[in-house]
């Protein structure tokens, strides 16, 4: 006699009930040959369902041995048991256990997805099985659109999808009317005639009599095992290929991609089924990611705005001033900064441009209009040194400086104050105190955080200011613009050394504007980091919310998880499905968060009329994607792991 296809040896199944241990199965010995049709019959509580769960590798014996096709199951891990269910067993449940969000064909295809069957053959086989079972017009129907008998036919087709060498039918007629139940039994007998091994679990002896062998179970023990050789045979189901599914050996990569696409599809269906909950969960991610990206963009925009203002005062410049420091009371009495120092500094290789500076206040008059303004005596290179741009006319040249020319360049505020908006100031003569000067240029307005934006400024040659207005020879300061190839610190040291050589004493100090830039960058970086950390904390809170929602989802979909495990899903497949769902929620939220942040940037720009721009970087957006992905993985892992470790028997029993 050939080796049994199924063999149980002295199997016990015990459960803990408080401090006691309850034996549900006792000393069960059973062997079933390939091609048999066996009915296991017993009253409710007799242990027949527990026996079926052990036969289908959904549960394990507490003691004893169980072999399937010669393979001992005792030491198999959960994934090896899943392989047995996938490759050998097909389940037909009393309550059908079809997934409500999938079509009839998709429900039938599910075991083949986990078996790694290619999509083309998978679609063809599922459709062929449904057609043979009389459902050719119902391939795309959802379970809710099918009658009970049609749903059970879909369940039978699903059991046959991977070949269904052993079909376990648990009360297959229990939820059906008599006529439909008889039709299901006829199909099972035809499948048995085609070579499938059928194990029929029922409490109804009239149903059990359709089998060739009836095993009675009571109080966890087999009390009767009778063969019925007189049972009438039936022809095989027309067109059935027999127990083995005709599929090529699966390619690991393709099989993994197919399972991934199935997980993605189920994630999308689950999200769509709970749209409000998904949107509320996603809203937290959207706000968190938008906050992170916006904070970084605000920090970068603020930093750039301040640096632009520093540039307006002079980009990469070093100022030489009398005294020891700002506010030195003796600075006014030091008169050693002179024009010769300017010429010496201008000859240095690190000097891009140099301008002396003296400043005073004076009354500015044009005809009958008088205003108070600041008069600055500077050199011809002043626009280059300070980044001043001319809107109209020109700046005075070296010749005007040499001849102490009475030329003046005015700012836009002075133009408005003296000439209004209708008179062209170029060529007009104004009085600076008692000194007449011809207007040769108007500077562009400068938006700056530093200084008074409403102040009036005019610029004249420093030689003119010294001789005609101030009546002195010494300068208030000298500003050197350092060329781009020289580090500011090196230029500062070289200027200090040169001035010490010229003056013979430290009667001056230098101020490097690069110090302001470095301070601004450090400050903005610190503030950006601080606010970003607050945003990250909010993302962690959002992540906990995602984990909570996913745990709720696992609880709601426990039965679905049990069905997937019954048809052969590995633990990794279940974990992958829920991880993908969590990551998908977070990724979509991340994308929408970035779009929200970009929209905020547009609104800020419009609200400030372009005066302030949020600066976005690809790095911050990539970081946002990484953050949203990590949130999905980190906070989706625990729910996914919880789902993967569910017991298939308990999951199937959950309503």
From Swiss-Prot:
Disulfide bonds: none
PROSITE patterns: ABC_TRANSPORTER_1 (PS00211), ABC_TRANSPORTER_2 (PS50893), MACB (PS51267)
EC number of the protein: 7.6.2.-
Topology relative to the membrane: Multi-pass membrane protein
Gene Ontology cellular component terms for the protein in this record: plasma membrane
Residue intervals passing through the bilayer: 280-300, 527-547, 583-603, 620-640
Cell compartment(s), UniProt: Cell inner membrane
UniProt entry keywords in alphabetical sequence: Antibiotic resistance, ATP-binding, Cell inner membrane, Cell membrane, Membrane, Nucleotide-binding, Translocase, Transmembrane, Transmembrane helix, Transport
Domain ABC transporter: 6-244
Protein name: Macrolide export ATP-binding/permease protein MacB
Originating species: Bordetella avium (strain 197N)
